[in-house]
């Protein structure tokens, strides 16, 4: 019990722990002074309970961000996932080939209305094997210090634009999200093959993954046209110039 206590777990989650103190501070300083606002929102038919939950969590995050040390890799994952619903950042294992994938459909597409998803396709990216890909990275150099530098580049996501590192730890075996290996499934097929999520990437990290995923597919942009000429042609078509 002493060993557990020394971790700080009880200090964080105990009845008079840090979370309790922070919540009390947030309640009296940030939320209760705005009670008229929340009463007004409720009168408008807004589901204020869930909004307040999200709002309170964001306040807690603000309070702790400047006080905690650097992240450890386990913080990247939530295991078991809080929700069994299909969520952006949820990691699944295929029942057919045992490969892992991560859901990268935008959260708005995964919203359920009337028992159905807003989208008719679940977008996932395959996760390459952690050790196998690190061996490939290390094999490019002969000296150990160079191998280490190459691996460090890889896990810092500097080696290539289409790989994103997922750390290997006690919660998940890790790997590299391969943005090139994109697959889409109808929701029913996805659920049949993948079942329940194995682990969920924490929201803070999901945003970074989505940003890099979007940037990878937007990197080439659109070829330049002669926009001046095109604009003239379009204007002449919709509003022909008057001839004198």
Predicted regions and their residues:
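A composition-driven signal for long, intrinsically disordered, charge-rich low-complexity tracts
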Residues: 1-25, 106-109, 161, 167-169, ...
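Compact nucleic-acid interaction/catalytic patches
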Residues: 105-138
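Cysteine-centered metal-binding/redox modules
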Residues: 82-90, 94, 112, 118-121
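Residue-level signal for functionally critical sites in structured catalytic/ligand-binding pockets
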Residues: 56, 90, 106, 110, ...
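Active-site beta-strand-loop-beta-strand hairpin of nuclease catalytic cores
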Residues: 96-98
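Charge-rich interaction segments
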Residues: 1-91
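C-terminal terminal-subdomain/extension
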Residues: 131, 135-244
């Amino acid at each position: 019990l002493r060993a557990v206590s020394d971790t700080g777990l009880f200090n964080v989650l105990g009845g008079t722990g840090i979370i309790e103190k922070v919540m009390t501070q947030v309640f009296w300083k940030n939320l209760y002074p705005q009670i008229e606002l929340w009463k007004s929102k409720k009168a408008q038919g807004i589901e204020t309970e869930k909004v307040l939950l999200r709002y309170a969590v964001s306040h807690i995050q603000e309070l702790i961000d400047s006080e905690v040390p650097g992240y450890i890799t386990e913080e990247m994952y939530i295991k078991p996932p809080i929700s069994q619903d299909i969520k952006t950042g949820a990691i699944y294992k295929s029942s057919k080939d045992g490969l892992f994938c991560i859901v990268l459909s935008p959260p708005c597409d995964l919203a359920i209305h009337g028992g159905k998803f807003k989208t008719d396709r679940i977008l996932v990216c395959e996760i390459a094997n952690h050790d196998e890909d690190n061996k490939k990275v290390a094999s490019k150099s002969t000296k150990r210090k160079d191998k280490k530098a190459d691996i460090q580049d890889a896990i810092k996501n500097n080696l290539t634009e289409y790989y994103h590192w997922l750390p290997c730890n006690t919660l998940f075996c890790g790997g590299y999200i391969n943005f090139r290996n994109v697959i889409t499934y109808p929701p029913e097929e996805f659920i049949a093959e993948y079942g329940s999520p194995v682990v969920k990437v924490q929201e803070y990290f999901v945003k970074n993954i989505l940003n890099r995923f979007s940037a990878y597919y937007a990197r080439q942009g659109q070829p330049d046209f002669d926009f001046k000429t095109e604009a003239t042609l379009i204007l002449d078509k919709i509003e022909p110039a008057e001839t004198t």
